[in-house]
Amino acid sequence: MSSESSQGLVTRLALIAAIGGLLFGYDSAVIAAIGTPVDIHFIAPRHLSATAAASLSGMVVVAVLVGCVTGSLLSGWIGIRFGRRGGLLMSSICFVAAGFGAALTEKLFGTGGSALQIFCFFRFLAGLGIGVVSTLTPTYIAEIAPPDKRGQMVSGQQMAIVTGALTGYIFTWLLAHFGSIDWVNASGWCWSPASEGLIGIAFLLLLLTAPDTPHWLVMKGRHSEASKILARLEPQADPNLTIQKIKAGFDKAMDKSSAGLFAFGITVVFAGVSVAAFQQLVGINAVLYYAPQMFQNLGFGADTALLQTISIGVVNFIFTMIASRVVDRFGRKPLLIWGALGMAAMMAVLGCCFWFKVGGVLPLASVLLYIAVFGMSWGPVCWVVLSEMFPSSIKGAAMPIAVTGQWLANILVNFLFKVADGSPALNQTFNHGFSYLVFAALSILGGLIVARFVPETKGRSLDEIEEMWRSQK
């Protein structure tokens, strides 16, 4: 088989796996699209107080995030027990059920009684699927990609996420222009979760054509199958020699099996969890989820909120695409460090714009530059580093812990952002700018941790990275 066809196979498998990331991003747009209709159909009929209604409305987002945490915690066991591909298949089923279930909840169960709880259950299933793909998609891609292309391919996870989000924003915009706003709020909104279910079906069908990874097959003793796949993925290499290297890594780790998660020391786990958590602690989802509110606080009209959100999605898409081209040229560590410093600068500028009530172009430019820097650094590079830095023998345990830390940081950031942004005492002084100044400080802290604890993995095989951690223990 020619090298071109082997490269085509690797690319095809990476693209199939990356659909999980597409669904990840698409669901964030679904969250934005269904907010008002859910309030109208499932909460307003209950005639609650404003505070109680707001709390109940928040359950929909919380249900997704709880599902994300649960999925990421289970993904390690699922990936080991059923394989990376098997776990992705399960996630695709979650997306299908979640999408069509949420779209049909009102028709099947009405709006009263337990209808909202049923709707939240389907949103929980969506989160479950997101939690699994956020771990197993980069793992799958890293284990089928050659070392010199691995960074670019794994960064496709973030590329897929931002593509999914942008696609969802545009789909929501098209829905709003297809009919009146009354039609969207009455029934048109159902197409947002239903479209997610359709993408889930495509994901499921394509996964049925994909094999599992050689690393997992070797782990399960299925060397013959691993050899056949390696011969297709790397026709220039000796598959038996590659299997021996993979198996040697597992065997060395088994000698330290009593140490479990910390078989290679605590530093590798701390570094991985830190990279995952700081991807959220820099404030990206506070900016993305609350962009309309942020722009209104800056003095922009509410009628431009959707277009501003799309502009953020476009910038994120463009610069994430650039990152996928340069991550293997400049390395992971420099992009993370300089990205942290760039985000810190932009958050500091934005916070000061709020603080000193500076409107116009400067705050808008700082937001878009922040998104651009994130898209070129922590957005995609986080997934590259997480997929590479953990030795194979502990990846099944360490990767879910890191991703769970990421989701917990996401919940923490969003909760505290709402508290701080609504605090009269803080706003009297900082005028909604306090949170952004905190994000600036956290960005600097994240960069310092990367500089001290995260190794450069560019150009190294997974076995070489494992040996590096073993020698440093």
UniProtKB/Swiss-Prot annotation:
| GO-annotated cellular components | plasma membrane
**GO MF terms held by the record:** carbohydrate:proton symporter activity
Kindly give the Pfam families that the UniProt entry links to this protein.
Sugar_tr (PF00083)
Membrane side Periplasmic: which residues?
A: 35-59, 107-112, 180-187, 279-303, 357-366, 418-429
The record lists the membrane-crossing segments as 14-34, 60-80, 86-106, 113-133, 159-179, 188-208, 258-278, 304-324, 336-356, 367-387, 397-417, 430-450
* Residue spans, topological domain Cytoplasmic: 1-13, 81-85, 134-158, 209-257, 325-335, 388-396, 451-473
The entry's keywords: Cell inner membrane, Cell membrane, Membrane, Sugar transport, Transmembrane, Transmembrane helix, Transport
The compartments listed are: Cell inner membrane
Bilayer topology annotation: Multi-pass membrane protein
Among SUPFAM superfamilies, the record links this protein to: MFS general substrate transporter
The family annotation for this protein states: Belongs to the major facilitator superfamily. Sugar transporter (TC 2.A.1.1) family.
Stated role: Allows uptake of glucose by the cell; allows growth on glucose minimal medium by E.coli cells impaired in glucose transport. Also transports fructose, but has a strong preference for glucose.
Could you tell me what this protein is called? Glucose facilitated diffusion protein
Q: Which gene encodes it?
A: glf
